[in-house]
């Protein structure tokens, strides 16, 4: 019996498929809470691209995100800048626009380790741990974080 069927039988439930994971420690951080709605929406769309092994290969290119409702590259650029300033994402590859070798910038979520992304020419090496460790940060001053 395959693992999916075993789980369904053991837990009496079906597999739910892929999901986008945003940990509470990130959602409750002052950096996230202080974001504009557009930056929060972009973060969700970047997390949506994550498949468990491609952190570092997430794109904010308009061509990719048009299907998710984005209309202006300037809006995306501003949201990316805000997410980077808040240290919620980092750029793993600089975009360049030279014919015929154009390529988009790539990003990684800071609360997950950066993965090996073959053939992506990342400028940041894969990591064993997340670049940012939210659980170790002092966050007691923020009202949403008090127990």
Language-model features and meaning:
Residues 1-36, 121-135, 146:
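Positively charged, structured surface patches that bind polyanionic biopolymers
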Residues 10-14, 26-29, 45, 59-60, ...:
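A generic short-segment signal for beta-strand/edge and adjacent turn/coil regions
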Residues 12-13, 20-23, 36-39, 67-69, ...:
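A short linear-motif detector with a strong N-terminal bias
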Residues 39-46:
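Short alpha-helical "packing" element that flanks the helix-turn-helix/winged-helix DNA-binding module
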Residues 49-108, 112-113:
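Winged helix-turn-helix DNA-binding recognition segment
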Residues 105-139:
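Short, amphipathic alpha-helical interaction segments positioned at domain boundaries
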Residues 141-147:
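Intrinsically disordered, low-complexity terminal/linker regions enriched in Pro/Ser/Gly
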